[in-house]
């Protein structure tokens, strides 16, 4: 895919890692590809990229942790950085918790959260308050012995058909 032809100036790649780091890089930074590839994000040891989205720099971002919390902030709270930068803290995570999902909310949509024990919850985006980046967030779904940890968060519309299944087991 040739990024230079597909996206105009003013677009960004917004990335989030499991350790709560976020990064916004101008899309033009990826227009000159090399045969050995390009580094998009410098990761700490043990950290992984959980999500990336192409944005216009004026959107909102929602980050969900496996502890059941969510934080919502303006994308403009994160400055644009070069390709090799590490990024900034998007969400403060307690010891042992990880980020599981990043969403760029659309107006009128809802968030469907699912727990490890099969519980689900559908919540309007307007129910999540907007804060500055770097906080611990608010409870999206209670994470306890009954529910288990949060395992997924996706954006859905009123007419969305949802199918959830457990992973297949090898025989």
Model-predicted segments: where are they?
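Single conserved hydrophobic/aromatic residue that forms the stacking wall/gate
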Residues: 1-3, 162-171
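Contiguous effector/interaction surfaces
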Residues: 75-78, 94-130
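Short beta-strand motif characteristic of blades in beta-propeller domains
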Residues: 13-17, 61-66, 110-116, 161, ...
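Alpha-helix initiation/capping motif
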Residues: 17, 26, 56, 65, ...
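Short loop/beta submotifs within extracellular cysteine-rich repeat domains
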Residues: 21-25, 31-35, 60, 69-73, ...
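Extracellular glycan-binding segments that recognize GlcNAc-based cell-wall polysaccharides
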Residues: 4-9, 36-62, 84-112, 136-161
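Core mixed alpha/beta domains of very large multi-subunit molecular machines
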Residues: 4-43, 67, 79, 86, ...
């Amino acid at each position: 895919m040739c990024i230079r032809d597909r996206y105009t100036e003013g677009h960004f790649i917004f990335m989030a890692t499991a350790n709560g780091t976020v990064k916004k890089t101008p899309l033009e930074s990826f227009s000159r590809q090399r045969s050995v590839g390009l580094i998009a994000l410098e990761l700490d040891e043990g950290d992984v990229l959980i999500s990336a989205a192409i944005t216009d720099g004026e959107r909102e971002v929602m980050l969900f942790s496996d502890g059941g919390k969510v934080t919502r902030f303006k994308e403009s709270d994160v400055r644009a950085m070069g390709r090799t930068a590490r990024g900034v803290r998007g969400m403060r995570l307690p010891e042992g918790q990880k980020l599981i999902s990043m969403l760029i909310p659309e107006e009128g949509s809802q968030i469907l959260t699912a727990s490890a024990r099969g519980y689900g919850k559908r919540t309007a985006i307007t129910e999540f308050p907007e804060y500055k980046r770097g906080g611990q967030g608010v409870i999206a779904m209670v994470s306890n012995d009954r529910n288990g940890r949060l395992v997924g968060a996706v954006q859905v519309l009123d007419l969305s058909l949802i199918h959830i299944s457990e992973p297949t087991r090898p025989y």
